Amino acid sequence: GEFKLGNNTPCLTDAQRNDVKQSIWQNIEKLRAENKLMYSDNEVNRGGQVLFNWPVQKAAGLEYNDVWGISGYVDHNPAYPNQLLDYNCGSRTYDAQSGYNHAGVDIFTWPFGWKLMDTSQAEIVAVASGQIIAKGDGQYDRSCNFNNNVWNAVYVQHADGSIAWYGHMKSGSLTSKQVGDFVTSGEYL
């Protein structure tokens, strides 16, 4: 089957995205002040190229071939609306009349998405080693439509200064590690 995106609602409003960025930078400044920031924001002192692994894995013992699908990619065409360009020169992305261009990769649980979520059979893992620089949990996680509800998320900064945003996570399922803690590539988030 196919699901058609209805209204191209961004995952986060501009205000929510700005709040996340502000929280990230406040945490980075706090970690820096406490001499706990593992990665410098000074380009000269950053590490080399970071290679990413895949952020979703099936739980141990699950006999499915896999537990994910992709519904949308980053929109690399800054024009809008309906000016789409994904990484493969295709149009598997979206934008909106407001000027929003999709800024992430939408990975969903499949097959039986709710069952996989309810039984914790799909796991979100770190794509690369890094430091947790923000996280938020306890938000509603059972939306059946595309919206911009506040999400459950973990944000990890890597050696090159890049920051991976892991959003739309199951409420109460986030790692027990705290802001400032280190995670390794493939570690449960």
Task: Show the residue positions of the predicted features.
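Conserved beta-strand positions that form and line the central face of beta-propeller blades
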Residues: D106, Y155, W165
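Active-site beta-strand termini and strand-to-loop segments that position acidic
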Residues: T109, V156-A159
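Surface-exposed, glycine-biased beta-strand/turn segments
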Residues: G1-N152, S185
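Short histidine-centered loop motifs in beta-beta connectors
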Residues: M117-Q121, V125-A126, H158-Y188
